[in-house]
Amino acid sequence: MKSSINFLPAEKRRDLHQLVEIIRNEIKDCVMIILYGSYARDMYVDCDRRRDYGVTTFFMSDYDILIVTRRRLGLKEYDVYARITERFFENKQSEFYTRPQFINESISRLNKNLELGQYFYHEIKKQGIMLYSSREFKLARCRKLNYAEIAQIARDYFSEKFQFASDFLLG
């Protein structure tokens, strides 16, 4: 996993350093903070303003951040995210400012998913940038899956999501 954000503009590096500081202050159980997604791949969109069919639209990439803790945050997760975001936006003037998006995972569940070859976590490990590590834990090795395992993961994912969709449609 990469550890440098030096390829990003100074303003983005400042934002990420500030987010790391805020996260570490808000979440004492934090063992790793990982940037993933478009900013980690250096394929982000800073601000794309378009006018299509008479409507002005804006698109901006967000900071995708995986917060790894000893135990999942559980029910307080969204309250913590709201506090972090609120503190991050203090003294920021522009309405078009890069927003952080968070997910939380326990180190044990993250490592289990890496060992199982779960694609989402594999991609985070492959393309992500370690912004902070307590050095208490190491990430597990990603395992290559055979076709049967890939097919089973796809079936399980479909079953879970299809059930949610069915429940939603049926009320």
Language-model-detected regions and their locations in the chain:
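Catalytic core of pol beta-like nucleotidyltransferases
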Residues: M1-I34, Y39-F59, T69-G171
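Short aromatic/hydrophobic contact patches that present stacked aromatics
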Residues: L66
